[in-house]
Amino acid sequence: MSESVRTNTSIWSKGMLSVIVAQFLSAFGDNALLFATLALLKAQFYPDWSQPVLQMVFVGAYILFAPFVGQIADSFAKGRVMMVANGLKLAGAAGVCLGINPFVGYTLVGIGAAAYSPAKYGILGELTTGDKLVKANGLMEASTIAAILLGSVAGGVLADWHVIAALVACALAYAGAVAANLFIPKLVAARPGQSWRLSAMTRSFFCACVVLWRNGETRFSLVGTGLFWGAGVTLRFLLVLWVPVALGITDNATPTYLNAMVAVGIVVGAGAAAKLVTLETVSRCMPAGILIGVVVAIFSLQHALLPAYALLLLIGMLGGFFVVPLNALLQERGKKSVGAGNAIAVQNLGENSAMLLMLGLYSLAVLVGVPAVAIGIGFGVLFALAIAALWIWQRRQASY
């Protein structure tokens, strides 16, 4: 299947809609699988500190394969790369259903996710460009967050009913994503003919890291998105421990409902960013980043469900407004310097290194017995300070 696709085409084109549907199903599977697998660990009496370790093996796959997945995304039609990556996710989820060690199956899903990410974001810059790219990113983030919303809730609710049924639903979602990938137009490879020697690929990747880091705008984007997603994944696991302590609720579903409120908020924030922020006014998103940390600290002190829902909705809105412009900035500047696939692969390395560090610190805090409420307060304060420092740094760099 092939189809000529020009940049600057409508964000409602066949190609873009196919990408969005595939992304929704794949992200639905990712989020349902996380909570279904956490329920499986609970049912098999794994210790609490092993829960973030599950995500750490997933993140470790991103870091290990970071030097290679960007070149893969740029060397082949990105829609086909997405299809193969979703096939790996399907294999991992099916393996957990069939009884293999959940950490092994989840690692395979992580490998698929590592290959998938540069292709899914890189293809946006091939289907559209300029300020339409910000809108396309908003659409992608809205689709992703809708999938997080539904997938997280489905994973928790189904796991309360039957853990294996929840795992089967995840595998079916990945199968649907593979099918949707078939309808993405086969675009010309962005950078064919590159060397496939591991040493050359590694060298090329780290050269891309250097190029992006030396550019003030892309460095700013890399640090900002890394902090955001590192904090976001840590918050998901914090909620799993915080809910029983602060609210006295012990089921699998309530943490997923709370995560869903963050997802709803991100959809709203992403939509606002698409309308209010352009590539030239990215710094408008920074106050929202600082407020995320402030609201997380306030949230950690709550003991009632209704204010918890409201504050998590606000956290999500601030998060969507913060991260969407940073993603668009990196894609646009990175496409021109190192290729969209390599730019996203470098971004993934930064984001997942931040996730690994934050999850490691969180797991250590749980292991030594720090209360969940204290972890939440400290986490929020440190995040606000980190974003404030990044903003000051960016303003100083811009003034030179």
Curated annotation (Swiss-Prot):
GO molecular function, one term: lysophospholipid:sodium symporter activity
UniProt entry tagged with the keyword Cell inner membrane: yes
SUPFAM superfamilies with a match to the protein in the record: MFS general substrate transporter (SSF103473)
Alphabetical list of CDD domains matching this protein: MFS_MefA_like
Transmembrane segments: 19-39, 53-73, 91-111, 139-159, 164-184, 195-213, 227-247, 257-277, 281-301, 304-324, 352-372, 373-393
GO-annotated cellular components: plasma membrane
Function in brief: Catalyzes the facilitated diffusion of 2-acyl-glycero-3-phosphoethanolamine (2-acyl-GPE) into the cell.
Family: Belongs to the major facilitator superfamily. LplT (TC 2.A.1.42) family.
Name of protein: Lysophospholipid transporter LplT
Organism: Salmonella schwarzengrund (strain CVM19633)
